[in-house]
A protein has these predicted regions:
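Glycosyltransferase specificity loop/lid
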Residues: 1-347
Length: 347
């Protein structure tokens, strides 16, 4: 979304195609401007459906996207002439090829993770993984001579415990490697100095990060609406006095973990801003979190919000410490704003 807004601010008209599952939440989370056209197509199925979800992505969505582009280009003055595909949706590159459109792929991953997905055939050939994507050795390996050594934790399919689902996911990544290779190049949310060995040895990966690029006229869409009171609260705090805690858009904490963080924050006597998403406050956690928030509000040393503009928060002079799950986007946000990761938080 950051890349789309940057392109729109530089004169391009954007048609942003999303799944129905995410569409309404992104549209309602923020404005996108008159150069944006937000469209959804059926995602096919929910994430709990496992292999069927992968089948829907691989076999159902390509025809839906192709039909959508045919319809727009047949009826609309603003025809689609260029396609930017999510790297993990390599089939969209093949759709563009069939329709005679130029295309590139975009990856929100680190260049190292991206290079791993582009090296599946080579990793099989060199004996690092077997035909089903399982590591054949516990030894670490390198994707380039001077790159950091990595292990199987970089394999996006290997975290699945169900063997059938893991193998199905691996087949998808195998097919995706072949499809996405047809893109002219792959743009990546990283920068040259951060992962130089990868960019040197994978010339088709082009760094364009860290995103966002410059100032955009509209906020990038998220799945949650920003709580703007977080900045108002930070404005009232002394310089370098606040601990900021946020664990991304997917990671969840159980009640024991929430209690441990709450106890640590209380013991530290530090001011803090803590992001706890609404989907973490349902069910068994709801009463506990309500009590926690009431207690924090009474003491006046902290604030809990559902979501906030992380870049604005990290750029605020009151922030002294950033505690995160060390996802790639959060890592880059921290680096941009002088909050460097410790040791091996991201390899």
């Amino acid at each position: 979304m950051h890349l789309s807004h940057f392109l729109a601010d530089n004169g391009f008209k954007i048609t942003f195609v999303n799944t129905e599952e995410n569409h309404e939440r992104i549209v309602s989370a923020g404005a996108h401007g008159d150069r944006f056209r937000m469209i959804s197509i059926p995602g096919g199925i929910g994430p709990e459906e496992g292999n069927r979800m992968i089948d829907a992505i691989e076999y159902d969505m390509p025809s839906q996207l192709e039909n959508l582009i045919w319809k727009i280009n047949g009826e609309d003055m603003d025809k689609i002439t260029f396609l930017i595909a999510d790297f993990l949706m390599g089939w969209a590159v093949e759709v563009a090829e069939r329709l005679g459109l130029r295309s590139v792929a975009f990856s929100a991953f680190s260049a190292t993770s991206l290079a791993t997905y582009l090296s599946i055939a080579k990793l099989k050939e060199t004996g690092v993984i077997d035909e089903n994507g399982s590591p054949k050795t516990k030894e670490k390996f390198k994707l380039a001579p001077t790159a950091t050594s990595i292990d199987e934790t970089y394999f996006g399919w290997y975290f699945l415990k169900d063997i059938e689902k893991r193998q199905r996911m691996f087949r998808y990544f195998e097919n995706n490697e072949q499809s996405v290779s047809k893109a002219r190049f792959i743009v990546c949310n990283s920068f040259q100095d951060f992962e130089l060995p990868i960019f040197t040895n994978f010339p088709n990966i082009i760094p364009i990060g860290p995103l966002p690029l410059g100032k955009t006229s509209n906020p990038a869409g998220h799945l949650w609406s920003d709580d703007t009171t977080s900045i108002d609260w930070l404005d009232q705090q002394p310089v370098n006095s606040v601990v900021y805690l946020a664990f991304g858009s997917i990671a969840t904490l159980d009640q024991n973990q929430l209690e441990e963080f709450a106890f640590a924050l209380d013991s530290s006597k530090m001011r803090f801003l803590w992001v706890i998403r609404s989907d973490e406050t349902m069910g068994e956690h709801h009463d506990f979190l309500k009590q926690l928030q009431d207690s924090i509000n009474r003491r006046g040393k902290g604030k809990i919000v559902n979501w906030c503009n992380q870049e604005k928060v990290l750029a605020h002079p009151s922030i002294a410490c950033f505690i995160s799950h060390c996802g790639w986007n959060s890592t880059l946000d921290g680096v941009k704003n002088g909050s460097l990761e410790r040791k091996s938080d991201q390899n």
